[in-house]
Regions:
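Glycine-rich, Lys/Arg-enriched anion-binding loops that position phosphate/diphosphate groups
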Residues: 150-267, 271
Length: 325
């Protein structure tokens, strides 16, 4: 049974997610989340300590020990020295360029993911492809690494309009009142469970999108005009539209679904101008072109279900009305 060591005391997101990534992608450490396996039955030992003898004997060490050596499975970052005049450091031994591209010093989390990507890439397992790793770095890891290394999002002379809550903040909430108690070890395990949830969410979403995209492309290729009609709604819909280079091709995207009462409706969405933008890429929805919900003061339902105040999404009762929005 392998032993993973992290430091004791207060924990942060970097070593919590480092352990979670190892559980997800390092051979022999996987656990079955659905079976609610007792932690005593995990296929590894997790030790929180700064004892140098224990650290030296461990199979994998994260965020403690003062060494970064992927061959020895040592993933600490505290010993890195920044070059003069530079606020970040890129250590020798990294396999990818994510940190260099973003000018972010890696923490234990980024070091572990970089290693795991290289491990699976070199063995051609297909379990951790580059596009999934890109998603992990973009959505989670770069931010975790930057925060753990004290790197500001903006210049320290600029004040933030508001302070966002990050995944690093949320993980910190799981620390107990006594960071050096046995209870703290249980809290660390709870934090790892939370991290695993988010990793599984991103992982499963990636494979779902890969599967759906093939059908989505076929739908796009089979239609003409500036209204894309889908047979169903897709998670990450606008990401797939963007991936298909079709954001500027369509003024409206329409799909059928049932409302909360089980009645048929047709949702209509305006694509954004750019991926992730709140600016519309086509004219806003106009509900005045559709029969109102209660026309002429009567209680008989009309064709219009709703139009969002932002005019980017709405719904009608019929496909014909959907084309008028």
């Amino acid at each position: 049974m392998k032993t993973i060591v992290v430091h004791d005391g207060p924990f942060q997101a970097d070593e919590v997610f480092a352990v979670a990534f190892l559980i997800m992608y390092y051979p022999g450490l996987q656990i079955d989340m659905k079976s609610l396996m007792a932690r005593d039955d995990y296929p590894f030992d997790l030790i929180r300590t700064r004892d140098e003898d224990i650290i030296a004997k461990a199979d994998i060490v994260c965020d403690v020990g003062g060494k970064y050596n992927t061959h020895a499975l040592r993933f600490d970052h505290h010993q890195f020295q920044k070059p003069e005049g530079q606020d970040y450091v890129i250590p020798k031994g990294l396999h990818g360029t994510w940190h260099e591209d973003m000018r972010i010093t890696p923490s234990a989390c980024g070091l572990v993911l970089d290693y795991l990507w290289y491990y699976h890439e070199s063995k051609n397992t297909g379990d951790l492809p580059i596009h999934l790793v890109n998603r992990f770095f973009k959505r989670l890891v770069i931010g975790i690494d930057a925060i753990d290394n004290g790197m500001s999002q903006v210049s320290r002379s600029d004040s933030l309009r508001y302070r966002p809550c990050t995944i690093s903040n949320i993980i910190a909430h799981y620390n107990s009142d006594d960071a050096f108690s046995e209870e703290q070890d249980d809290h660390f395990a709870q934090a790892v469970d939370v991290a695993l949830f988010h990793l599984r969410y991103i992982d499963s979403g990636y494979w779902r999108d890969e599967f759906n995209f093939e059908t989505f492309k076929e739908t796009i290729n089979s239609q003409s005009g500036d209204h894309l009609v889908l047979e169903q709604w897709y998670p990450s819909l606008m990401n797939m539209v963007s991936r298909a280079n079709a954001l500027k091709k369509y003024k409206r995207i329409i799909w059928p679904q049932l409302d909360g009462k089980g009645k048929q409706e047709y949702r209509v969405q305006v694509p954004p101008k750019d991926p992730g933008s709140f600016e519309l890429g086509a004219p806003p929805l106009d509900g005045s072109k559709v029969n109102p919900k209660f026309p002429d003061g009567h209680k008989t339902e009309g064709d219009l279900v709703f139009v969002h105040s932002g005019k980017w999404i709405g719904a009608t009762r019929t496909m014909e009305a959907a084309y008028k929005l």
